[in-house]
Amino acid sequence: MNCKEYIEHIRDELKGSMSYYWKAKEAKKDNDTEAFKYFSKLAVDEYEHAGVLFKMLDEHIKKKTADDKYEGVYKDLYEMSIEVLREEYKETEDLIKKA
């Protein structure tokens, strides 16, 4: 995978996690214990997978920053994208902890 693919995959995982979080919250409101457990587990799984992908992306960038094509503007753009993702990841983590 390249940086763009990692970023897209992480964003998809975070979106999935949030979707499952809201379903779990709705199930809790409806007193559906089984659905709550099911969706909560899926939300955490997606969130944890995003964390694994972050680590892989960091390693990928460390290897690629030595290449000229990743210097300058491209590197800056990837770093900005990653910072936005880190904020989304933190927001997801905070919501999951509250559930």
Where are these predicted regions, by residue range?
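Non-heme di-metal
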Residues: M1-A99
